[in-house]
Amino acid sequence: MWDYLGNIKVLAAAFVLVGIAVAQQVTVSGQVEVAAPPRHSHLPADAVVWLTPPEGAPPIQVTDVPEQHPSLTQKDKSFSPHLLVVQVGTLVDFPNHDPFFHNVFSLFEGKRFDLGLYEAGTTRRVRFDRPGVCYIFCNIHPEMSAVVIVLDTPFYGISNRRGLIDIKGVPAGRYVVHVWDERSLPEDLAQLRREVAISPSQTSLGKLRIRETDVTLAHKNKYGQDYEKPAPPGPGYIPQ
């Protein structure tokens, strides 16, 4: 015989547990501090911090990939925004808003691709289907660069100009903290990785001290070669 009261109690307990789980989602905060060479001091903006399960724990299911595609726009021989953070599976648009051709490519771990030449007013797309850091360039214009960070977690934040970071909707539990900064060496960033316990009473990551470097490396074109130097300007017209 169906136990009506018993099932009501089970359902009530389930709703209570769901309510507790939702209530235990918190906003995790932190602050980035930058140590840079004296001549190259930078604002602590655009550092990326994200949380993943510790080793041996089940992975986070990425389910809320946006229906609208984020864009990395090409305009005035630059990418906008310079930094884009997406979850695995996201389709990113690369519209060309310049009155000339571009050739967007990446040869790095997050996604290797070459969109080829495409003209003004057209758009090409890339689905980023694996986690990693993608450095994006144009094969025609060496001054163009951008970064797409692809994460297998929805729990991430980007520091503002004051270095403040908020990561919203994080369930209570244990996580590994990861940090990325464009001007920092990978080995320095690896030292910031640590495991933390997040709970309603413990939501702060504290201060994340990032050491930046003034080393900049010139990148190659998509063939692994140096870019061709632009031709010198021709002689000006002198009216007779």
Q: What kind of feature is each model-predicted range?
A:
Residues 7-21:
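Bacterial N-terminal signal peptides
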